[in-house]
């Protein structure tokens, strides 16, 4: 499983960022979604982004955010990528990409084969795709729910953009997830927490050790 790149999402403290970076994370994810226990205010996010060392990409996760909200985030926080994790259309993805001049990763929720065409549709506009478990109906959060999907749905498939696997990943199931899907990039949030929004440095280290 050599060379799997890891994004640790939903970091809330500078020590979280340092734990992720020192263990070898390629990306750190900062969440801007008030319903989430991982939500950050702008000043807090700015401090975290500045704590990330060179070479670690800083990603802002938003959910159906307005231009006004995105303007404020991009102005305040030094970023390398935007992650759109709501119901944004390919047209909206293209608008955001053009407006800010930043790469955009679009999340696509998967529960069954009928969800797979969205991956190609969003790939026409986004720079990367995050393939995540579709949240249950009525769920408050679009991601970070600790749920997996049937990895066989994407086994052996190829898309036109780089992609990242998410959804219920832990140090214990990571090797199996990568073996089944062929993922070269993975995203984890709840799988390295001791409680919602509370990252565990030991779990971060174990996850990244497994990814090496």
From Swiss-Prot:
The keyword Lipid metabolism does not apply. Its EC number is 5.3.1.24. It comes from the Bacteria. GO terms for biological process: L-tryptophan biosynthetic process. InterPro entries: Aldolase_TIM, PRAI_dom, RibuloseP-bd_barrel, TrpF_fam. The keyword Amino-acid biosynthesis applies. Disulfide bonds: none annotated. It catalyses: N-(5-phospho-beta-D-ribosyl)anthranilate = 1-(2-carboxyphenylamino)-1-deoxy-D-ribulose 5-phosphate. Pfam families: PRAI (PF00697). Keywords: Amino-acid biosynthesis, Aromatic amino acid biosynthesis, Isomerase, Tryptophan biosynthesis. This is N-(5'-phosphoribosyl)anthranilate isomerase.
């Amino acid at each position: 499983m050599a060379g799997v790149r890891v994004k640790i999402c939903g970091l809330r403290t500078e020590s979280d960022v340092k734990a992720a970076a020192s263990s070898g994370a390629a990306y750190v994810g900062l969440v801007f979604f008030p319903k989430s226990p991982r939500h950050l205010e702008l000043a807090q996010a700015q401090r975290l982004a500045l704590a990330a060392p060179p070479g670690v990409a800083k990603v802002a996760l938003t959910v159906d955010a307005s231009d006004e909200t995105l303007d404020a985030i991009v102005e305040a926080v030094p970023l390398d990528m935007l992650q759109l994790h709501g119901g944004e259309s390919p047209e909206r993805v293209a608008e955001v990409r053009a407006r800010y001049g930043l790469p955009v990763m679009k999340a696509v929720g998967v529960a069954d084969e009928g969800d797979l065409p969205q991956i190609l549709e969003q790939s026409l506009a986004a720079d990367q795709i995050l393939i995540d478990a579709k949240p249950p109906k009525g769920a408050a959060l679009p991601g970070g729910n600790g749920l997996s999907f049937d990895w066989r749905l994407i086994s052996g498939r190829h898309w036109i953009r780089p992609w990242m696997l998410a959804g219920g990943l832990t140090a214990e199931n990571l090797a199996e997830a990568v073996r089944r899907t062929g993922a070269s990039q993975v995203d984890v949030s709840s799988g390295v927490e001791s409680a919602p929004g509370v990252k565990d440095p030991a779990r971060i280290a174990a996850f990244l050790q497994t990814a090496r």
